[in-house]
């Protein structure tokens, strides 16, 4: 079993890379600029007895997108069987402030790159095998890291949200188009790790303001990944791991607050 995790050097990408290694996967750890962090993750994976390789690529550059999957297959010694499209640009804009540059950056990293990697992944993967019932078992799994925002739209982070909406559509259409050889699913994290530009106070408030009055932990995200790995009959699904954030209903009109 071989996996490629984009944005695998830090945060949830790191957690998923280590989780996959703990389950016996050899892992290619993609990074854009965090080489030291990627090398550290590779060291941890190798300590678990699995192959690992750090692979640099700028996912805003088409040629580097196109080369990443072949590089992962070569580094790990065979076809990649699990692709985690995790790398993402998350920068603020709205309908009034968005520029061509902010639009392109979000679309390239959050939608175009996963599309290109999905194409390459499907092309190098063996066809589905059959089980004891003579029914096909997909040989590949793609997980697209989306966002609970696609379930609860707001006008904030406009380019990012629109790109993630596109990634959700890509998840569903590729689940259709690549079946039965590849399963494609998505995870929508809510407040899990404090953001680089976020104060601790705001992060704690964000977690508390979910339906469950708690956010997710990295282990909740890897548990969702494990569910998809272990569920050969599941494809085209989005699992929001967000404390119910996408179900938030206590708005001022409901609470009687003017």
Give the role of each language-model region.
Residues 217-241, 246-247:
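C-terminal substrate-recognition "lid" of short-chain dehydrogenase/reductases
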Residues 129-179, 191, 245:
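Catalytic loop of short-chain dehydrogenase/reductase
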Residues 1-28:
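Canonical Rossmann dinucleotide-binding motif of NAD(H)/NADP(H)-dependent dehydrogenases/reductases
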